[in-house]
A protein has these predicted regions:
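Extended, non-catalytic scaffold segments that flank or surround catalytic motifs
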Residues: 43, 53, 152-161, 168
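Phosphate/anion-contacting hairpin/loop surfaces
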Residues: 51, 171, 175, 305, ...
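Ordered core of a single globular domain
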Residues: 179-239, 243
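Assembly/oligomerization interface modules of large self-assembling protein complexes
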Residues: 33-102
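Sequence/fold signature of self-assembling virion shell proteins
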Residues: 217-350
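A surface/extracellular/periplasmic glyco- and lipid-processing/surface-interacting theme
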Residues: 165-180
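N-terminal alpha-helical "arm" segments
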Residues: 1-43, 337-350
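Long, contiguous amphipathic alpha-helices that act as assembly "spine/axial" helices in icosahedral shell
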Residues: 81-160, 177, 181-208, 324-331
């Protein structure tokens, strides 16, 4: 028929992508807001780090003094491939789908359309969870380990703002100076990374040590001076707002999101917190780091030619035989890039 629509055509698949709601994630959506897609498999970035030089005083008859330009460093990254897929077999489409009314009378074609939406949602959710994990790793460790089938490498962003407290200086220790630590570390980011951090994200244990500290409790209980306010409330995506410190000026959060680690020890996979319990992150609330997507390349069934697409996601489908089945796969090349070097700080505090 002239008006018959193939639900697996590229046009229809693109519409499915637009209609499927995204999984919102705190780190990716808050800190990596400069989203860019590239037509190449590699992403090149010129990094320019400024300084605090001031213009010189000169005599009117001597003339000006040259202010030499700063150099730059070009970093080249190759976004890794993420390529989950699912299989639709004919026998699945002849029977009722989960949640379908017993007497709905849905045709196999209608079931195929519904299952396509469900499959894409599953693939997209898995890909988005991986993007969030990558974004957190880039901030917490300054690296992204790319470990999978046939790949084992590490992308290193050169983070140097890493602190570790030892012995009695740890939060909860007899010589702990939590407020002094935060003041020194916010200054360090301002001086070395040229960024005003206004946010602290604490791991579970770090948060407990912070609020159990006698000096912190005394400061927050000072009725003569407004040095902070504790007003916890839950926010979307597993984030909880704890309150605000006035000196240093920081909004306090905990992020309770977890991930399923089945690659470190495949024989004993476990669920882990994205933010380690004993760590804190000091960061600006609007750093506008880059979320880069490399080009997606695949063979088009109709022409048999390689096709390159400049997009964050490619959803495609193809048929295999013996047994007959339709494959639905998603391809993406995401890479969160914290392109402002040392504009945040991470610390192991307990």
């Amino acid at each position: 028929m002239a008006n018959e629509v193939n639900i697996y055509s590229p046009r229809y698949l693109a519409e499915v992508v637009r209609q499927t709601p995204a999984v919102h994630t705190y780190f990716r959506d808050t800190f990596f807001t400069n989203v860019k897609t590239f037509a190449t498999e590699r992403v090149d970035i010129d990094l320019v780090k400024g300084d605090r030089r001031m213009a010189a005083f000169v005599h009117p008859r001597v003339g000006g003094k040259v202010l030499k330009a700063n150099g730059y460093q070009t970093e080249s990254y190759k976004p890794p491939l993420i390529n989950p897929y699912d299989v639709t077999t004919a026998d699945q489409l002849m029977t009722r789908l989960p949640g379908e009314d017993l007497y709905s009378g849905m045709t196999p074609a209608q079931r195929a359309a519904q299952k396509l939406m469900e499959e894409y949602a599953t693939l997209n959710d898995a890909t988005t969870r991986r993007e969030e994990w990558m974004a957190v790793q880039a901030i917490v460790t300054g690296t992204i380990p790319i470990v999978g089938e046939g790949v084992n490498e590490t992308i290193n962003f050169g983070l140097t703002n890493k602190k570790t407290l030892n012995g009695d200086n740890k939060w909860g220790g007899t010589k702990a100076d939590i407020l002094g630590n935060l003041g020194d570390w916010t200054d360090a980011v301002l001086h070395g990374g040229f960024a005003n951090v206004d946010t602290i994200i604490m791991g579970k244990t770090a948060k407990a040590k912070f609020f159990a500290d006698a000096n912190v409790q005394k400061m927050l209980d000072n009725r003569r001076m407004n040095l902070g306010e504790i007003a916890p409330r839950d926010l979307p995506n597993g984030v909880k707002y704890l309150g605000h410190l006035n000196d240093p000026s920081l909004d306090m959060y905990v992020y309770g999101e977890v991930y399923y680690d089945d690659w470190t020890n495949p024989d004993a996979p476990e669920t882990k917190p994205l933010i380690p319990d004993n760590m804190i992150i000091l960061i600006s609330s609007r750093p506008n780091y880059m979320m880069a997507y490399g080009a997606c390349t695949y063979i088009e069934d109709a022409s048999g030619l390689w096709v390159t697409s400049q997009t964050s996601r490619v959803l495609r489908s193809y048929v295999e035989h013996h047994p007959d089945r339709r494959m639905v796969e998603l391809q993406a090349h995401p890479l969160p890039i914290p392109d402002k070097v040392d504009s945040w700080l991470v610390a192991t505090v307990c």
